[in-house]
A protein has these predicted regions:
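A polyanion-binding, active-site-adjacent surface
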Residues: 1-198
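Intrinsically disordered, low-complexity and often Lys/Arg-enriched segments
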Residues: 199-204
């Protein structure tokens, strides 16, 4: 499969539907062949599914891009040149408790995993930005808390990894003042990487 073929294949995916899982949207992601940075979220939200069909374009997305602006990224340029994907690609529906979105099950994550694997192989982003606990666990494991990971830089399988907390307004993580300092350090790392790495043709 090539990167040109991948969006059409992804849009026709029926793996979760055929397995009996709720599907609240068509698959949502943004792919660019020259992407140096790739954000990886949990799953599209309701706003993305029903209104924009763009990753991180609801209230959480606005907060995310305010953070990225502090690191020197322009939203329009980022969307046009970088990659934005998720652990699962379709809106999973509301949380049973009535607040926020349902967390995709492990089975759904496994069904969607080949898409992320293909994108990592085809795009080869230098920097991964996993956003929120589910995505962070995918790349850095679940043995360490977000408190110990946010504000640090890691290298795995040829990728630099800079985790960010989920920008949801429902997150309690930001109630701890020290966590805001950790977020600031993470954004400083991203700003430095943008200055050092630059566009794809500047990479070794």
């Amino acid at each position: 499969m090539t990167l040109t073929d991948l969006p059409a294949s992804l849009s026709s995916c029926r793996r979760c539907a055929d397995a009996g899982y709720f599907i609240g949207s068509t698959p949502i992601s943004t792919l660019n062949a020259g992407a140096v940075f790739m954000t990886v979220g949990q799953a599209p939200g309701r706003h993305e599914a029903e209104v924009t069909h763009l990753p991180f374009s609801g209230p959480a997305g606005r907060r995310l891009f305010r953070w990225l602006a502090q690191a020197g990224f322009d939203e329009a340029t980022f969307r046009a040149t970088q990659a934005m994907v998720a652990i699962t690609r379709c809106y999973p529906g509301p949380h049973p408790a009535g607040r926020g979105d349902r967390v995709p099950s492990r089975a759904e994550q496994a069904l969607c995993a080949p898409w992320l694997a293909a994108e990592l192989t085809l795009i080869r982003p230098r920097v991964l930005i996993p956003i929120g606990g589910l995505a962070i666990g995918k790349f850095l494991g679940n043995d360490t808390t977000m408190t110990d990971l946010i504000g640090e830089r890691f290298e795995r399988d040829g990728h630099l990894i800079v985790p960010l907390p989920h920008p949801s307004g429902a997150s309690q993580w930001f109630n701890v003042p020290e966590n805001k300092v950790r977020l600031g350090r993470a954004l400083e790392i991203l700003a430095e990487l943008q200055r050092l790495i630059g566009p794809r043709d500047a990479q070794s």
